[in-house]
Every structure is written in structure tokens, then in C-alpha cells.
Amino acid sequence: MIVAVLVVLVTLGSVAFHMWSPWWWSEIASNWVGMDDTIILTFWITGAVFVAIGLFMAYCIWQYKYNKDKRADYEPENSKLEWALTIITTIGVIALLAPGLIVWNNFVTVPKGAYEIEVVGQQWYWMYRLPGKDGVLGTTDIKNINDDNPFGLNTDDPHSLDDVLIDADDLHILKDQPLKLNLRALDVLHDFYVPQFRAKMD
């Protein structure tokens, strides 16, 4: 009985903490509201499943607690239950995936006239490369990377000669300017995250 009560308290307490948590997202850019809507939809669907499973576990713990006069039934197959769970799971997966795929498609589709920026990660630091006056990012080669050339620029490429190199973590961008960010790293896997865009890429 105590275990069942604890399961109920943990389940409902987790939901309450999420609903009234002091930590929440930062303000999102106005053109990415659909991303937050998708995340909230995911919370509702997975939250409902979480509560249902938690309460069902508590019910089973209470209802089927040990009793020497009761014996468990052996039922290796139940086709009705299997079909019901398969259909419900399929509907849930579609409900989760469909909105996310739409938002993801909008996120990765580069609009015309997007300003191209290269983002380079290294432990524990970010660098940025912007096109110069010619408006074109020059080519790079990992073989060219050294202390004097951390971006690995190809000095034989005329487009590389006027690229703007920013050796700092912060990058300020123009308002209402579409961007295309090209990510690469000098060493290990990095996690690039812009909270205001909900943009997160490893």
C-alpha cells in the first residue's frame, strides 16, 4: 500500500513540478512559435502517457498485492490486447512525429537570400566566419588548420582572403535577416544551441 501511494505521489508530483517549475524557456523568436507549440503538444501526449502508466502501476501494486489465497493466471498471448496496444502506440507515434517533421522541415529549409555563416566548435569555445565583401565564404581544408590558421582557410582561394573571422563566443546578428549556419568542429562533437530559436544541433 505504501509503495502504491509513493508511486502516485511521484507521478503527480512530477507533473506538478513541471507545470509550476521556476525554470522555463527563454523568450522565443516570433517566427518560431510553431516550435514551442510542437514541444508543448509533445509534453501533453507524453505527459498523459506518463500519468496513465504511473497510476496503472500504482493500481496494480495495490490490487494485486500478495495474497496467499490468490494465484496468478498464465496467459502467454492476448491478441486483442496486442492489437489495441499496437494501434494506440501507432496513433501516438504519428501524433508526435507529424508536427515535429513539419517544424523540422521549416527549420532546415534555407530561405532565399539567407546570410551564410560558418560556426566552428572547439573545446570549450566557438568561432565564426562570415563572408567578406564578395559575399562568398572561401573554401577550407582540415589539413590547413594550425595556430596561425585556426579555420583551415585555403589561402589559394581568393574568396577566403576577405572572409571575416570572429574569434569569440558571442555573435550578434541583424534583425529579420534569414541565416544559414554551417556547423563544423576542430576536435570533438559539440552541441550548438540558440535558446531563442530552439535551435540545437550536435
List each language-model region with its residue ranges:
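Transmembrane alpha-helical segments in integral membrane proteins
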Residues: 50-66
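Alpha-helical transmembrane segments of integral membrane proteins, especially early/N-terminal helices
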Residues: 1-19, 48-55
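Alpha-helical transmembrane segments and their helix-start/interface "positive-inside/aromatic belt" motifs
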Residues: 1-8, 39-43, 82-86
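Non-transmembrane, membrane-proximal soluble domains of secreted or membrane proteins
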Residues: 16-39, 61-202
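Alpha-helical transmembrane segments
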Residues: 36-52
